[in-house]
A protein has these predicted regions:
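Short, high-confidence coil segments that cap the C-terminus of an alpha-helix
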Residues: 43, 88-90, 118-120, 217
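Hydrophobic/aromatic residues located in beta-strands of well-ordered beta-sheets
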Residues: 5, 46-48, 93, 123, ...
Length: 242
């Protein structure tokens, strides 16, 4: 099985412009993500996908593989364009978030391994939520899944809704999980989901994976114990343990 790792990267972000090129202890964010991804032995190849010349040149300078794409609304669409245009073809594409400079290669391996099951079309990771602050944070996407570990729903709001219990009992009555924003797709499925129309639920929650669920695509969810730290605003860099 040939697995392609793609790191979609755009320069402009509403909360952190130029994020991929921000310096983190002497290396750009995109370089740190790329180097972590390269440590995953299950990836046959790793590319950065961008529509920005500055990011392209930066990746070339540190010796990484990079391809220019057209503008896209999502990293998923950017991954699809790159995967379809490469001469070499891959069975699975892993969409690696470009704002997680400390991503653990074991998380990528954990996700890639799920595709040894031929029934896995799309896959992602989740980690149990332990605090009320994290549960109530709208930047933390929550996921619920069935007994076979297929996603039932994603939301920026707590699911299931814990408000019928006092706050101190929330974690007694339910397990809550946050979505780790790394995806794997079979290459043919990636192409299919990028041709789907946006749905109203997707627009409301600003979560593209709801479009896939509403179109009956199954998303396998694997629980991980490994923490994930995304950089949403500049002050998040101070929290990194480098």
């Amino acid at each position: 099985m040939k697995v392609l790792g793609i790191i979609p990267a755009r320069y402009n972000s509403s909360r952190f412009s130029g994020k991929p090129l921000t310096d983190i202890a002497g290396k750009s964010m995109i370089q740190r993500v790329y180097e972590q991804a390269k440590k995953c032995e299950l990836l046959s190849s790793v590319f950065v996908a961008t529509d920005d010349d500055r990011i392209f040149e930066s990746v070339m300078e540190f010796g990484g593989q990079v391809k220019m794409t057209t503008e896209h609304n999502s990293g998923t669409e950017r991954c699809n364009e790159l995967a379809q245009n490469l001469e070499e073809k891959f069975d699975v594409v892993i969409n690696i978030q470009g704002d997680e400079p400390c991503i653990n290669p074991e998380q990528i391996s954990q996700l890639a391994t799920l595709f040894s099951d031929e029934d896995t079309a799309i896959a992602t990771l989740a980690k149990q939520i332990k605090t009320a602050n994290e549960l109530l944070n709208e930047n933390t996407v929550k996921v619920v899944f069935d007994e076979n570990n297929f996603a039932l729903n994603f939301s920026r709001f707590p699911i299931p809704d814990p408000k019928s219990f006092d706050a101190e009992k929330w974690f007694v009555h339910n397990n809550f999980y946050k979505h780790i924003g790394i995806y794997g797709y079979r290459t043919r499925v990636l192409q299919e989901i990028c041709e789907l129309e946006q749905t109203e639920r997707e627009k409301t929650e600003r979560l593209e994976q709801l479009r896939w669920l509403e179109n009956t695509y199954k998303i396998k969810v694997e629980e991980t114990e490994l923490e994930s730290h995304s950089i949403d605003v500049p002050k998040d860099i101070e929290k990194l343990n480098l």
